[in-house]
Amino acid sequence: MKSLIYGYGITGKSFERYLQKKNLEFDIFDSNISKFKNIEPFEEYDYIYCSPGVPRSVFKLLKTKSNVLTDLDIFFREDASIKIGITGTNRKSTTCFHLYQLFKSQDIVNLIGNIGNPMLDSINNGKKYSIIELSSFQLDKMSVNELDFGILLNIAEDHLDYHGSFEDYKRTKKKVLNSKKFLKTEDPYEIFEWVTGSKAQNQTFKDLPYRYQKVSNSIINDSKSTNMHSLQYAIELANKGLQNKNYVLITCGNPEKERFSKVSLDGPEEVLICGNHRKEISECIQNTNKKIFLNLRKALNHIKHEKNIKNILFSPGYPSGTDSVSYTHLRAHET
């Protein structure tokens, strides 16, 4: 029996470890890695192990050629833990991480999935619960929903380049509601009580990096913000938390995936737009107090010479596109 791993990112490498443990023969294909391009015709493989980020059209093609499996399919089939699936456009990583902290004191939980910890590395590792962060890509490729508990946090327009329409994106996200039990909430305490039947002790949660993270007294790094809804949320937090402390917003990325929607951002003293897509972003952002810079370094140099600016909110609001931002510039900057 011969298998193919399609895609060699985090999930693809976890497929590799999984198949090696089972002593199974396999090839690897990744269009971005030259040494992984020479493979047999797809029909020659008994199984194709497919990563979540593979385009939908390719995934459908592969299914006509062979038996296609995802890491979620395998985890459902082989793992015995109680499975808690969490999805949403925004705050899914944070909610998963906060819920994990409520369980963690008992050492009975996995935190896996889109948050960056591969599912296949946690199969039957003795934990009672598995908190699984689920992206729309994973849900789209999910053949059968075997979640014991499904949580939908929120839905807003995102990944329209993959889904084609907001209606399709919503339909995909709502697949989590076909779980054995489902809930719509963003409250980790409510989720914990719903799953376990007992109340959790109040905690001061640790937060994930790059999600409205204070990296100094004057800089907030929200660089995981890659859609306009998460940017608006960051601005709401800044408007409340930085009262009487003026701040600038730095934004960048590719507005194509937001379909070049027009937006006005209320709160920042200035909006600094930088990166390869700066002109397109400038056409989208309707603020009059905006300035355009070639890159992040030049935007920060501008701030250094503005004595009235006290705080920086770095929240891109768009996927990175062709921008390659070095956040070390941000961390090194003190106002």
Describe the residue ranges of each PLM region.
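Short, basic phosphate-binding NTP loop
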Residues: 1-85, 211, 282-285, 293-309
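C-terminal helical cap/extension that packs against the catalytic core
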Residues: 255-310
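Conserved substrate/cofactor phosphate-moiety recognition/catalytic segment
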Residues: 112-124
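Residue-level signal for inorganic ion chemistry
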Residues: 19, 48, 86, 114, ...
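Walker A (P-loop) phosphate-binding motif
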Residues: 72, 76-112
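Flexible active-site lid/hinge loop adjacent to a nucleotide/diphosphate
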Residues: 126-186, 322-327
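Nucleotide phosphate-binding/pyrophosphate-handling subdomain across enzymes
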Residues: 14-18, 108-109, 187-269
